[in-house]
Amino acid sequence: MFNFAVSRESLLSGFQWFFFIFCNTVVVPPTLLSAFQLPQSSLLTLTQYAFLATALACFAQAFCGHRRAIMEGPGGLWWGTILTITLGEASRGTPINDIATSLAVGIALSGVLTMLIGFSGLGHRLARLFTPSVMVLFMLMLGAQLTTIFFKGMLGLPFGIADPNFKIQLPPFALSVAVMCLVLAMIIFLPQRFARYGLLVGTITGWLLWYFCFPSSHSLSGELHWQWFPLGSGGALSPGIILTAVITGLVNISNTYGAIRGTDVFYPQQGAGNTRYRRSCVATGFMTLITVPLAVIPFSPFVSSIGLLTQTGDYTRRSFIYGSVICLLVALVPALTRLFCSIPLPVSSAVMLVSYLPLLFSALVFSQQITFTARNIYRLALPLFVGIFLMALPPVYLQDLPLTLRPLLSNGLLVGILLAVLMDNLIPWERIE
C-alpha cells in the first residue's frame, strides 16, 4: 500500500522533483516549435501537452510500472532523433505535414511494439545486446547530440532549416553562459546539501536576470487551443521515417534497463526480477501510444534520476508522486502553464546542458567494465567515429539516397548504436587479446 502521509521533508523533496521534471520538460516544446515552423502562439499548447503527458507518464510508472522514484519523460534519444529527421527532411523539401504524419505513425507502432515486448518478456533478452561497450558509445553520442541541442538553444539558433539572415545575439548568450557557470559552481564547490539545488537556483536566477537585463522581451501571448496533432497531420507517409522511428523505439528500451538497474542499489528489498522490467516497458509503450495525438516527445525512464536520488537521499515514491502532482497542476491551470512558458530558452538550455554533462561520467563507468587493447578498440572506435561523421554531415549530401534509408542514415546516433550492437555481438572480442 502507498503511504500518503505528508511531511515537510517529503514536500520539499517533492518540490525538488517537480523542478527536475520541469527542467527536463520545458526545454522541449520551443525546439519543436522551431523545427516544425509553428507560430509562437502554439507554444502554450505544446507546453501544456508536455506537462500533462509527462505527469501522467510518471503516475503510470509509479503505480503500475517499475514503481520506483524514476522520472518518465521525453526521451533524449527520441528528442534528438525527431529533431534530426525534421531538419534533414525539411532541408530536402519534404513537407512538414508529411514528416509529422510519418513520425506519428512510427511512434504509434513503436509504442505498440514496446508494449508487446513488455508483455512477452523479450525486453530482457533484447537488453543483453546492449553490452558495456555499446553503452559507452550510447552515452557518449547521446551526450554529444543533446549538448549540441542545448548549445543551439543558448545561442538562439533555429532548430529547423537554417536562416541565412540569422545573427547571434551576444548579450543573451553571455547571460546563458553565466547561468551555466553559476550552476556548475554550485555543484562543484558547494556542500552537497546546497549543491543539489543547483538546477533550481540556476533556473530561477537566470529567469529573473533575463527579464531584468532584457525588459523588452515579450511575454507569452495567445489563448490555449486544444487540438489533435498540433505538429501537423494528413500528410503522405514516408516508409523511411516510420522505419527510423520504430528502430528508435527499440533502442529506447535500453533506457528502461539502465534506469532500473541503476536504482537497484536504492531498493535492495525489492530484489531482482524480470517482472519490473516488463511492467515498465508496458507502461512506457502505453503512454507513448495514447499521447501520439498530443504530439509530445515519446517517453522513457530517465537514467539521470539516479543522480537526483543520490543527491537528495530520498528514494521514496511519495516525494516523486508529489512532484508529479505539482507538474499535473501546472498542466491543468493555464495561468501556471503560461507562467512557466515564459522561461527563456537560453536559460533553460544552459541549465539542462549542465545536467547532461555527467553522461560522460556514465560512459566512463561503463568503460571500466571493459579491458580495451590496441586490437579490440575498434569495437568502439569505428561505430563512434562513423556516428560522429554522420551527425556532422549536411543533409543535402544524402539527397540521392533511397527514401527508405535516408532518414536512418542521416541519424548518426542511431547508425552508431546499431553498428556498435552488430560489431559487439557478432565478433567474439573476448577471444581477441
What is each residue range found by the language model?
Residues 1-69, 80-93:
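N-terminal signal-anchor module of multipass membrane proteins
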Residues 1-2, 6, 189-204, 223-237, ...:
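Hydrophobic, small-residue-rich membrane helices and short re-entrant helix-turn-helix hairpins
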Residues 7, 31-64, 246-317:
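Membrane-embedded helical hairpins/re-entrant loop segments and their flanking transmembrane helices
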Residues 8-25, 168-180, 197-198, 211-215, ...:
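Hydrophobic, membrane-embedded alpha-helices of multi-pass small-molecule transporters
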Residues 58-123:
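Membrane helical hairpin/interfacial module
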Residues 66-79, 128-134, 195-200, 296-305, ...:
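Short, non-helical or kinked segments that cap or interrupt transmembrane helices
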Residues 83-88, 187, 305-320, 325-330:
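Interfacial segments of multi-pass membrane proteins
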Residues 96-216, 324-433:
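Membrane-embedded alpha-helical modules
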